[in-house]
Amino acid sequence: MNIQSLINDKVSQALEAAGAPAGSPAAVRQSAKAQFGDYQANGVMGVAKRLGTNPREFAQKVLDVLDLDGIASKTEIAGPGFINIFLSEEFLAKQAEAALADERLGVAKEEQQNIVADYSAPNVAKEMHVGHLRSTIIGDAVVRTLEFLGHNVTRANHIGDWGTQFGMLIANLERIQKEKGEVSMELSDLEGFYRESKKLYDEDEEFAVTARGYVVKLQSGDEFCAEMWKKLVDVTMVQNQRNYDRLNVSLTRDNVMGESMYNSMLAPIVADLQKQGLAVESEGAQVVFLDEYKNKDGEPMGVIVQKRDGGFLYTTTDIACAKYRYEELNADRVLYFIDSRQHQHLMQAWTIVRKAGYVPESVSLEHHAFGMMLGKDGRPFKTRAGGTVRLADLLDEAEERATKLIEEKNKDLSAEEKAKIATTVAMAAVKYSDLSKHRTTDYIFDWDNMLAFEGNTAPYMQYAYTRVASIFSKAGLSMDELTGEVKITDEKEKALVAKLMQFEEAVQAVASEGQPHLMCAYLFELAGQFSSFYEACPILNNEDDAVKQSRLKLAALTAKTIKQGLELLGIETLERM
């Protein structure tokens, strides 16, 4: 149950009954401090101002008609007109029982929408690098959350599998096949293959002529070129899949919807834009001038959709892409997890899409932009030599560092168990370090902080789960076979249950805002509340069996909530660390 939403509805009804205009926002929020209750209604002051009345007097009118029977034990007016709401122990205990009995932990499914999520999007014939990490793991966490809430989600891996560079790549692939008859080993180093192809193109005119010819042939459907192109795509995606699997990312080859997929749509779209009077000729190119965007001279900005040589641009592909996602995938929402530097480009493409009538305003097109991963020097994260860090190398180093850490802390574990723990902790650390940061900001990549067992980190959260689970293993009990009822008799118990009951609010916030850091923050706060509860409230050695059973239930619900929350982030838990 979303308690915040429930109270918000109740306060909204009371506002209207007290004389507020229909639809006035109740603005119910989680209270920042326990002294202000569990929730706070902040909408009274804004309504009172519009009505020209005293906020505290109006707040009292609202309280007089506010029906929170069976939900709140106390309500009070604070400051200039805030309403503080304290949940009752009986209500919280009842909600905790219901959540523990539900495999979804009380989280209701939402009305299903068709949602397309565009994320990861590496380029063909290039290895994934750290710049692909944020889109890949942020997108995947949001997708998992949306599916948990019951939505039909289409994963769209918009790989860069088209363009003039494929001429030189195909020409080089052909050269290698003729010389060695074997391709797979040469392509194991995709970056090297790409650099070699570019060097040949720049230095060997005969090779360059062949390469340019292959661009034309590929675009016209030549069988040999198509076969070579497919080989490049296949080899790239096999390598990418290794990274996805290591990171526990849910993308597969079936989710690939590359740039090439929209090729047949581009010419008809330009023709339609011309027919609608949106695209006009300018210096031989087809251009859409947008009043919404101005150039440095204050004139409408021109967006090229077809070059003078007949070639198309990324904007044209993005227009086709949005059109396809609405018309063929029946999208209600389309989420783009793309670097913040692409914002204007996307906005211009979507403006054209709306003007042309390809996607109605009822369909939400959302740019979930993200900042950059920076090194400790505050500059883009690079190798010591100043090069781009390969994602596979980053994951290898994470495993090496985690292995050393686990060796130091768990000398008595078997080699197999140490390896399993190290791999799980390493991948979790890389992901959580990123996911716990606000999506839109740049962040400093710091190995020491990532792998720390203190603070808002993956090792801390994984250990928090293990710690709770160990209560049951020590006692030889199953979390699913507990008896008795939840009874709240201590302030620490109440604080823990109140935080547990905010899980649905965190899930829904991630889904609506595309911000996984909200789940990380929630789980970290929950782990902190459990620590306070565990220190103050004896469980296994409690002499009162009813209290013991109740507290075991709270521990079980905590473990299940942490596990489910981390699962939505794509992070595995461990029963033993």
UniProtKB/Swiss-Prot annotation:
GO MF annotations for this entry?
arginine-tRNA ligase activity; ATP binding
Query: EC number(s) in its UniProt entry?
Result: 6.1.1.19
CDD domains recorded: Anticodon_Ia_Arg, ArgRS_core
Localisation per UniProt entry: Cytoplasm
Its catalytic activity?
tRNA(Arg) + L-arginine + ATP = L-arginyl-tRNA(Arg) + AMP + diphosphate
Task: Give one GO biological process term.
Answer: arginyl-tRNA aminoacylation
One GO CC term of this entry? cytoplasm
Membrane-spanning parts: none
Q: Which InterPro entries match?
A: aa-tRNA-synth_I_CS, Arg-tRNA-ligase, Arg-tRNA-synth_N, Arg-tRNA-synth_N_sf, ArgRS_core, DALR_anticod-bd, Rossmann-like_a/b/a_fold, tRNAsynth_Ia_anticodon-bd
What the entry lists under Pfam families is as follows: Arg_tRNA_synt_N, DALR_1, tRNA-synt_1d
Keyword annotations of the record? Aminoacyl-tRNA synthetase, ATP-binding, Cytoplasm, Ligase, Nucleotide-binding, Protein biosynthesis
First-listed, main subcellular location of the protein, grouped into a coarse class: cytoplasm
Residue numbers covered by motif 'HIGH' region: 122-132
Q: Which family does it belong to?
A: Belongs to the class-I aminoacyl-tRNA synthetase family.
Subunit text: Monomer.
Q: What is this protein called?
A: Arginine--tRNA ligase
What gene, per UniProt, encodes this protein?
A: argS
